[in-house]
Design a protein with these regions (language model features):
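S-adenosylmethionine-dependent methyltransferases
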Residues: 1-216
Length: 216
């Protein structure tokens, strides 16, 4: 479990409206923690009588969890069932390097064009420069105009290529802001448990990229 996946999941739990009532896609999912949390939040939101979704939101709401590795995809499908979100959550093969950064749809690994989504989620999906390029292309192609990308990565001192991501997002036309997660919510998002995650180093900075695809 990467530290950024835990951090992004905690951020979503404090900002459930970021995914509730929306169609979300997690890219480079690994074990799928972030996508699973998004799906559980959607189910809880829908079950809470104080939260009212219109018919269009109810029909649209759902989560797609993706990765490119066949074994990982099989494990993701198991995790979706294990967490009882298989009614609103699907697993799809997606390779960053098959996305152009100029398209109005994203491609599954079967080559089929897929509908764009409201929200793209990603955590620690960059470990080399080409990943930054591919991830930016994927976020652009996957998002509807007006859609939002929410990405958390360890800083460039710990993940090679992350320092390129901001510029690559701008290249494909995404509006981009970057925040240090340690400075949000009085540091509570990073307050405990990270020593148990893979690759965590004391003092590691986790960066929150908020991306916006302009309306056409």
């Amino acid at each position: 479990m990467w530290p950024s996946a835990v951090a992004l999941s905690r951020w979503l739990m404090t900002n459930p409206s970021a995914v509730c009532g929306k169609r979300a896609l997690e890219i480079g999912a690994g074990c799928g923690l972030t996508g699973l949390v998004a799906a559980r939040l959607q189910k809880q939101w829908d079950a809470d009588s104080s939260n009212v979704l219109d018919q269009q939101q109810q029909q649209r709401q759902g989560v797609i969890i993706s990765d490119f590795n066949t074994t990982v995809l099989q494990n993701l499908q198991h995790n979706v069932v294990l967490n009882s979100v298989d009614d609103i959550c699907n697993v799809v093969g997606l390779d960053f390097y098959q996305q152009s950064g100029t398209a109005s749809s994203w491609k599954g690994m079967d080559g089929a064009a897929r509908d764009q989504v409201d929200v793209v989620l990603a955590a620690d999906m960059i470990c080399q420069l080409s990943d930054a390029v591919g991830a930016a292309n994927t976020v652009h192609d996957a998002l509807l105009p007006g859609g939002t990308g929410i990405v958390v990565c360890a800083d460039a001192a710990h993940r090679f290529g992350v320092d390129r991501f901001h510029a690559e997002c701008q290249r494909v036309g995404l509006e981009t802001s970057v925040q240090d997660l340690g400075e949000l919510n009085k540091g509570k998002l990073l307050s405990m448990g990270f020593e148990q995650t893979a690759g965590y180093v004391e003092g590691m900075r986790l960066l929150l990229f908020l991306l916006k695809k302009p309306q056409q």
